[in-house]
Amino acid sequence: MRLGVLDVGSNTIHLQVFDAHPGSRPNPSVSHKVELRLTEYLDDQNNIDAEGIKALREAISGAVTKANIAGTEELLPFATSALRESKNGSEIIREINKEFEIDLQVLSGEDEARLTFLAARRWFGWSSGRLIVIDIGGGSLEIASGVDEAPEAATSLPLGAARLTKQFLNGDPYTEKSILRLREHIESQLESVLQAKAHHETRDRAIATSKTLRTLARLCGDWFDGDGRTIKLDSIRKISPKLAEMTLEERSKLPGVSPNRARQIVAGAFVAESVMRNLDIDKLEMCPWALREGVILKFIDWQLR
């Protein structure tokens, strides 16, 4: 069957259409993405403003049209932290569902972590043993670990790259003071993960998903003679301050770094470094599957019941 996944995230609105059948690998056939940066439309009361709502409606309208043209039999739309945490998010979702006749659902942070973990487990297989899976999104950080398809521990923290950039970083290049405040905040937020560190200590493989981490893996590979498919702690320790010293224009000229990603990559790098250091992870392996694939896999599993 042809399934569409509509991911309403903090950075982008991303439609992916898959040809998916029980017992087979989901094959992507159509991809449509609009960079939106919803977090930049939040006002002082944590409401998405009128301009942001308009941009969101236009992006979803385009995605729904693309899904219909692609012959999508079932559309699975979901929203993550930007709509989940905005004060008027529920009202916006009701209006969108009514206007476009879809069923946009909000995923909890824990759901994000669990579905991403499922995708990583299916990709690497049972022989990969105990996994810890890390995803740095625009609005939140997800960490999950376990030996089965459902993780034993799943955590979501407000440490997304877009959120932190807006909240802490200023100047071009970013000021040392704002970088220091950012790093102190990351460390304080990670305390809750460290309290549950026992869940993550024994592992066979540490896995990374998300565009932010893929970009960092590529940069680590280019700068430190890596393979572009892993992130080593030693490399991320070196790359984080180098990125922070660059201007926005300089970062946007780096391979694989879009202008939008150039704003956020500094915060993402410091989150990655802090997570790896605090959880004693020497190396992260990149996984090409993540949340959207997890949603597809969960839907197929549900159909088989």
What does each of the following model-derived ranges do?
Residues L3, V17, L36, Y41-T72, ...:
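Helical "lid/coupling" subdomains associated with nucleotide-phosphate turnover
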Residues S10, G138, K211-R214:
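Short, glycine/acidic-enriched loop or turn micro-motifs at the edges of active sites
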Residues G139-S145:
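Acidic, divalent-metal-coordinating active-site segment for phosphoryl/phosphodiester hydrolysis
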Residues S24-R37:
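N-terminal glycine-rich anion-binding loops that anchor highly charged ligand groups
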